[in-house]
Amino acid sequence: MSKFTNKTLLITGGTGSFGNAVLNSFLRTDIGEIRIFSRDEKKQDDMRHEFQAKMPEVADKIKFYIGDVRSLESCRGAMHGVDYIFHAAALKQVPSCEFFPMEAVRTNVIGTDNVLTAAIEAGVECVICLSTDKAAYPINAMGITKAIEEKVAVAKSRNSGKTKICCTRYGNVMCSRGSVIPLWIDQIKNGNPITITEPSMTRFIMSLEEAVDLVLFAFEHGENGDLLIQKAPACTIGTQAQAVCELFGGKKEDIKVIGIRHGEKMYETLLTNEECAKAIDMGNFYRVPADNRGLNYDKYFKEGDEKRNTLTEFNSNNTRILNVEETKAKIASLAYIQDELAKVGK
């Protein structure tokens, strides 16, 4: 973490689960300052009190900026002296974005453009934009706007001066805000049925710590315009629900199938067939370089493009599929789950 020594890091949408994970990982390092940029003063105040209580010796490294990525001036006001940015601000609830698609455009697309414009103007060294598997072959408003966010990042990277811009794309982050596992735990505690959409649906799963690791990998190894992807495992929704039931004493027969929600897919994709043509296998990660050809395609009428796919689409059906015991182990390793199990005496 030597590159963060005495540096200033700005996290947009910083009061969310990702921002909390970064603070837990970074605060006790020699980083200079972490700026939390978000629009909800209540969440900022809650975060301030939380970290003053649990890390009083380093909590003064956190600085809070109220603002909104939808406003370019708001973004500019938080950029002075910033070295690095983790851009996590987003509207990410699939059904909500289906009903309010223009709100998703304003935050996920225009907001990203504002953050990158302000960062380039301020001479920020590196910006990592957080994207999602729903941006690959998108069928819902959330995924479509995140796909455009990725396009905006690549376009901005072509004229970004000294600012390096990369994107990360990852799957479902377990126990992040608005995710399904905390809902299931509450349902079990209250003696209610555990509601799932479709048991055979598959989803990539990763922890918040793995999400932070992916961003750090992009920071260290990404080049301007790159997209970085982690090779995450997956499980079915039915397996995940059964794992949570077994951990918290729920009954398998209490699992209730309610049907697929607005805009959901049966499986998700992290690396598309089209991206495979240029993707570079980096062990536990894929790196997809930006397509920086100009708009002059005349030569391709004569020469063509010799690149051919050497990889195949990486999706939640063809990755490593975890069974119930493996899924239980992964879920049980999470700090949130350990705290919840302690509350119920397990």
Which sequence ranges carry the predicted segments?
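Conserved Rossmann-fold cofactor-binding substructure of NAD(P)-dependent oxidoreductases
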Residues: 63-84
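Hydrophobic/aromatic anchor residues within beta-strands of the central parallel beta-sheet
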Residues: 64, 104, 165-168
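Conserved glycine-rich Rossmann-like NAD(P)H-binding loop of the short-chain dehydrogenase/reductase
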Residues: 30-46
